[in-house]
Amino acid sequence: MESKSLRELWEETEKLKDSSSTDEKTRSEIVEGYEKCLKLVLQLRIFSSNEEVDEIKTSELRYLMIDYELAKCVEQWTKGDRLKAVQYAKTHYETFLSICDDYGLKPMQDEKPKTEADTRTLKIARYRMRQNLEKELKALSKDSETNEEQERKFWLTKLQIAVEDTLDSLPHIEMEIDLLKRAQAELMKSEDSPEKDEETLRREERKQKEGSSWRLDLNTRDKILDKNNRPLQPFTIVSDRNETRKNVFGFGYNLPTMTVDEYLDEEMKRGNIISQKDNPPKSDSDDEDDYEKLDAKTMKDRYWDEFKEANPRGSGNTMVNRG
């Protein structure tokens, strides 16, 4: 099979580039085509750093664009290893600028800006120059009667536009490479380190505190309830949630700490209540205050009234949830 010439490879690749297809397969074919062209250029030794741009044949000026076209195509790739793609593009952009510099094809505004205002001014100037070059290139491409002089001017203009575009693209590529490297380093660091990030640790600690503030841990060393679910020892549940709930849905008063029977028994022990056994009832007295004639139920009712008078609502024990 006869191998294709450099001109044939170039034209086939240019047709693919100008086609409406933008899928990854087509892009790969375009890159492959330009890489074959570049390989042939090196083999044929078409260019030399010792010659001037005027010494290059008009028909061969287009091949100075190969590195630029490779960089431009790969820069637009979105799938696969993005860092590898932008590094590839950066390498070919810089190679293109180096070749153009060797042949004296330098940017129109070559001075370096000193301030931010100078940078903005330079960008505006380059943008306007590029617009003028593109208009000139468009006019040259429409001319049906193209001679060698016009063709040469066409390719030199296209090279100048590519130089300006490269100078605009390189800062963005360098910034993207820096961001991608940082992201890659952070990813490797997180994969290598078993430690969790600070935000995750704070979130888990907060959840643990919220859970432990109201849950009763049944796995403690000492048992709390017996087989009949009766408490073996006093315990208190301290809870921010319960405190809040009590303030919102609470009784509005503090609950008593003992029953009426317990209160009466305690008063009897203290001697504040006279037992019927110690003082038999008198048969000739119908006084309502004679305790000896009152049965146990009446006595409890009276002392319950006394208890309520002595302990108004809201004056009892403030500790709740005791078991």
Swiss-Prot record:
It comes from the Eukaryota. InterPro entries: TAP42/TAP46-like_sf, TAP46-like. GO terms for molecular function: protein phosphatase 2A binding. Belongs to the IGBP1/TAP42 family. One of its GO terms (biological process) is regulation of dephosphorylation. This is Uncharacterized protein C63.05. It comes from Schizosaccharomyces pombe (strain 972 / ATCC 24843). Residues 185-214, 271-294 are annotated as: Disordered. One of its GO terms (cellular component) is cytoplasm.
